[in-house]
Amino acid sequence: MERGEQVAAKTDNLDTRLTIAAHHEAGHIVIAAAMGLRLRPEGIMVDKGAWGLACFYKEPDESDESKESIIVATFAGYLAQKRFCEERGYSCPLPDDLEVTLSPDSKEARGIETNLSKQYLGTRTVPEVHELLQQRAAELVLQHWPAIEAVAREVASTSLAPLKPLKSGTQWSDQTSARSLPGDEVVKIVERFGIKAVCVTES
């Protein structure tokens, strides 16, 4: 699965929305790399309508550690978007707004949370774990903010090019062009910030 659609930014300025989208997707992919998840060759794409995609391997194995990593990386997109908007004074949906709680990212994370083992949960409820993992994601976004900003800047500075199809064949955008940063380029950027990342092609 390669999906990282951001929560809609509350601005009519397209350039601003593109930059916000770049930070959302950078949040996903940088924290995915920091959590040891493998990146996909497609990397990051933000279409000309300011909707984006972060491509990393989201299929968890049976371990709770794998599920936790994917949940945290999934939360990180909105949290990076929120941090960027707050820094720049842009309006951003609040965590409890329906467009956040019902977003594709939130639904995806909650779906994985229901598959966490009883051993992992212990005496905690799923909602309690949800809050803890959101907090963990927020801490990682803060810790790796320089890397997130560097990746986002690189995405936002690229020129629009014809939209490339995903290797999976999934159509993620109805636009014809997008800004993109391949996975191997993401690896080079985050390594400058001490993150050991891996980009692999699915066999």
Question: Can you describe what each PLM-predicted range is?
Answer:
Residues E2-S203:
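Soluble catalytic regions of large protease machineries
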